Amino acid sequence: MQNNFQLIKNIFINFILILIASVFSIFLLELFVNSFLPQFDPRGMVAYQVNDEGVPLLKYKNQSMRQWKNTGDYDVSVFSNELGLRNHKDIKTNYIDAIYVVGDSYSFGQGVEESERYSDQLEGLIKKPIINISIPTDFQGYDRLINYAIKNGANIEELIIGVCMENDLRVYEDINKGDKKDSFIRESIHFIKTKLTEISALYCFVTSVVHGNRILSKVAKNIGIISKNEAYDLASSSALMNSKKKTLLSSVKYLKIIREKYKIEPIILIVPSRSLWLGNNINQADEIHKTFISMLLTENFLIIDPRESFEKGGTPMDYHFKYDGHWNAKGHQLVSSIIANQIVKNNLKKF
């Protein structure tokens, strides 16, 4: 009995010693990376928050932040104005004939400088002020962003809504339903990874090394530690394949709600899903893409779809970052020219 107690005691003591040594080692490594590899310092990185009214915004206001991807895709500056939006313009200013842009991370300009976004390049092409109020979110978030901008003095008469075909389409009536256990696990993992990215230089360094090494990256993807960003599989990450009709109807309905609520005839900019060109659901993605646009046209929405231009050269993924998947500067430049040409071609004087 005495021997068993002593054995348990020794195991416990050894465990505590190993734990203390591990924590101390991690602490030293964190200090080392912070001191000698400042490019991995997470301080000042882009962060988001939802305000008391449910509006998604940049967390820090009136300052520039850094948006960095551990895959090496980008390292850019993001300025947040006094309202928590990525725009140097003051929306309270009475800009004549201003066009507002709302959308998710593509329209926000993830991975590119503010001046490289399609909205900012469009301003130079059509010689009209463009005010971008985009934040990574969905139709519900776009609705709240438009309302937030109006409450803060914006006069929105002309609007472009960037619709991301990868994650904007959903059954909005069921947005708070679903598998709570599965959702909790996914959200918990995402929360932990996000927090580590925000506070740990060591985590940023390690993930960068993993992404940069072909073997380590493959192992990490196979066990699910990192996402397979370069081959986005629409069917595996949404319920679209199982409830396509319901999802598309609900998505079109929400866009109609926005149009009627704010008395605006928006241009709908389609952000094509990468599943059109990658993964195992190319045919399904093609069907969804065409069906959704057809439904929008039936409801008399103005549509701009850059898909054909992306595919024209045969290498549509050249307009996206290699790993992150968002549009790169080349993609934004192409989209800005497409929008400008469509505005001129269709004689959209309002725009």
Q: What residue ranges belong to the model's regions?
A:
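N-terminal Lys/Arg-rich, disordered targeting/topogenic segments
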Residues: M1-N10
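Hydrophobic membrane-insertion alpha-helices, especially the h-region
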Residues: N14-F32
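Generic structural signal for small/hydrophobic residues in well-ordered secondary structure
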Residues: E30, D104, L159, R259, ...
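Membrane/wall-proximal cationic-aromatic binding patches
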Residues: L37-I131, R144, Y232-A235, F310-G314, ...
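Conserved SGNH/GDSL esterase-like catalytic core that processes O-acyl groups on lipids
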Residues: F108-F184, H190
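Short, amphipathic alpha-helical "lid/cap" segments that border enzyme active or binding sites
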Residues: F139, D143, K245, L249, ...
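Serine-dependent acyl-ester chemistry module
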Residues: E166-I293, P306-K312, P316
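Catalytic His-Asp segment of secreted/periplasmic serine-dependent ester chemistry enzymes
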Residues: S275-L278, N283-F351
